Amino acid sequence: MTEESEETVLYIEHRYVCSECNQLYGSLEEVLMHQNSHVPQQHFELVGVADPGVTVATDTASGTGLYQTLVQESQYQCLECGQLLMSPSQLLEHQELHLKMMAPQEAVPAEPPPKAPPLSSSTIHYECVDCKALFASQELWLNHRQTHLRATPTKAPAPVVLGSPVVLGPPVGQARVAVEHSYRKAEEGGEGATVPSAAATTTEVVTEVELLLYKCSECSQLFQLPADFLEHQATHFPAPVPESQEPALQQEVQASSPAEVPVSQPDPLPASDHSYELRNGEAIGRDRRGRRARRNNSGEAGGAATQELFCSACDQLFLSPHQLQQHLRSHREGVFKCPLCSRVFPSPSSLDQHLGDHSSESHFLCVDCGLAFGTEALLLAHRRAHTPNPLHSCPCGKTFVNLTKFLYHRRTHGVGGVPLPTTPVPPEEPVIGFPEPAPAETGEPEAPEPPVSEETSAGPAAPGTYRCLLCSREFGKALQLTRHQRFVHRLERRHKCSICGKMFKKKSHVRNHLRTHTGERPFPCPDCSKPFNSPANLARHRLTHTGERPYRCGDCGKAFTQSSTLRQHRLVHAQHFPYRCQECGVRFHRPYRLLMHRYHHTGEYPYKCRECPRSFLLRRLLEVHQLVVHAGRQPHRCPSCGAAFPSSLRLREHRCAAAAAQAPRRFECGTCGKKVGSAARLQAHEAAHAAAGPGEVLAKEPPAPRAPRATRAPVASPAALGGTATASPAPARRRGLECSECKKLFSTETSLQVHRRIHTGERPYPCPDCGKAFRQSTHLKDHRRLHTGERPFACEVCGKAFAISMRLAEHRRIHTGERPYSCPDCGKSYRSFSNLWKHRKTHQQQHQAAVRQQLAEAEAAVGLAVMETAVEALPLVEAIEIYPLAEAEGVQISG
């Protein structure tokens, strides 16, 4: 009978994706059990299992009943065919099926095939390979198969004795998965196939059921275990075998019998099909350990050893002539190398298939965010990220669609999934002399961590169960508890880089890390063609093209492209600075900022110049120093005016008038309509609106700053001039940051800090040329242009250049005729504030003379008036005290 490959129809909506192999699963239990395959597990062997109530097949060659079975969590495995079942009742029903298949059947006339029942997404259907009929149970399918066997008298049915069990890998499809299992028979009469004799036909027919999950992309061969799949793929590439594995391979080849030849390969099936294969003939196991055990039990090791198959070009050992021929073809035809990731392939078709992965050909687009996916299942899993109720939510506020990412994130929290405190974790490799982070000064005693014990759990564990002390979950076996604690509550760095020895949590992290050693960047950006070494870095880079910032601060509304940047930003709002300098007491919320700060105390910077004794804090400053001072080059040039600068920082500080005139002012304030040239200026302008309050409007021109108290123009009060003092309402104070000295308000913390230097006299920015100090760094930059002779601000009308932008603004008023500064006394206007200040000094002198004259007249008239003046010459009379005797003369008293 020829073999007909049947496709498996899936009715499951996959919701869970494995982060290691990107395989999809439909339930939580499946993905948890599958992820155990990526973790080193302990295997147990059940030797000599015998149950009088169950018919167990024995090995006819050795007469022994030794079976090896892998113990799975909460599963029951049939010792005859290796199938995994979910409950004891299902195991009993399954074993009854084997008993019915082994019972002899009487010849009954063939019946017409029954009508196939309708498909259902909640049951498992069994399909007949002859008439394509579907059945809802194994009993119906078995009875129907007997009708086909009775209709063919030339091939009478014979009792079936199942071969030795196959050690299955991690289960992918369970008994309750809504999948149609399609059965198929291997081709009979193939090359090397054992043809049973007439006597053997009436006694035994050895049948084996295998679950094939892994498909080779080169030759479409199917495999059951990942170890066999990887071993097979190594035969397609010319790679030497390590010395440690060569004796084991030679022993396995010698133990094999020359009569054992692989059966012809079946028709290739899609890699995603969960299909079973029935083979007639000698049972051929896919697992090397099971195959070696069966050979030892059957006595095949004593047979004649097969000839060792070595490659004459690279001395590589192979298990079969077919594998050797495939390997020799790679030597004859050569290999094909990928130009993007340097992988080699034995054929052009496999290379083209691999290049399709780099081209990111995705046909399923998300209508919300525009991301593309290769399969519809991935798109459906992504679409849940846009729904208001994600599948997995963490108490810290994060939500996840992928279960694996949620489990990895949950391990970053403390015991029981409680979020850790916001104190940043110090680096893994401590810096020499680096202090420990100081505890937060909150004024409250730090609560001790409660001890984890059985008394703090929900209650005593039930007899015969094992309880987890961290989450109070109970298990029936100690092995399950151990695996639960290792997989859920502890994140071990089990994967090591073979080059630098660094440990990682996942294999994918190791693969991405290895590209840092090799320099590979196989993931180019489709927008700017910039390559990256991992898909995560590419996805993070693409946010710069789309402008998307998914992580937003709930306090100030500022958005970020990475969650780590948002966490660091939240420390600013929390005023939590755990890293404190031991010398000056300054605190920082990042450890590297404290490390940089400590260099200022020592005076020795880490990067020293080899040609001169100067040292620098940053490497780029050292490179600029060597390039400019020792090499005499100025590589950074302004594209508008052609001015050359030694560093990119100087070029950014260079305010080119030509570029400023050409640059459009695209940022407009939504409150007053003012346009500015950058987003930073717009943000500062809107902050000024917020500090002013909702009812006030900012002036187009900044108001003239108030004169210092010592030089303020003395305006005679009505009381001093003999008039009547009228109470004027105090102006409403605007909201903002207030100076504790003069009660002046500011919109930003930076402006307040700069203003406080006026009261403290601090000038932290000295000029390295003349030693003059300034309160602001911008004042120092403007001052240094006097030494360098640089005049970057040129007038576009007459071409006159200035070193300070304020001087250019004053000069432009000559051409425009604008005079924005007017005197409040006489109404005369001026182009600059300095000219107005000089003019107001004339009014101050007139006011001072008038006040002195009035005081002299009052003193002469009364004779008892005493004028108190300050020690310093003040422009305004601050106090005029007139003794009570002056009231009789009708003089107004002010005090």
UniProtKB/Swiss-Prot annotation:
Write down what this protein is called.
Answer: Zinc finger protein 574
User: What broad class describes the main subcellular location of this protein?
Assistant: nucleus
Q: What does this protein do?
A: May be involved in transcriptional regulation.
The reply on keyword Glycosyltransferase is no
Q: Could you tell me the gene encoding this protein?
A: ZNF574
Residue spans of biased composition, Basic and acidic residues class: 274-287
The GO molecular function terms of this record are: DNA binding; zinc ion binding
One GO cellular component from the entry?
A: nucleus
Entry keyword annotation includes tRNA processing: no
ZnF segments: C2H2-type: 16-38, 76-98, 126-148, 214-236, 309-331, 336-358, 364-386, 392-413, 466-489, 495-517, 523-545, 551-573, 579-601, 607-630, 636-659, 667-689, 737-759, 765-787, 793-815, 821-843
Sorted keywords for this record are: DNA-binding, Metal-binding, Methylation, Nucleus, Phosphoprotein, Repeat, Transcription, Transcription regulation, Zinc, Zinc-finger
Q: Could you tell me which residues carry Phosphothreonine? A: T724
- Region annotation (Disordered) maps to 239-301, 434-460, 687-732
Biased composition annotated in UniProt, kind: Low complexity: 707-731
Spell out the family assignment given in the record's similarity comment.
Belongs to the krueppel C2H2-type zinc-finger protein family.
Q: Which residues form a coiled coil?
A: none
Pfam families linked = zf-C2H2 (PF00096), zf-C2H2_6 (PF13912), zf-met (PF12874)
Q: Which InterPro entries match?
A: C2H2-ZF_domain-containing, Znf_C2H2_sf, Znf_C2H2_type
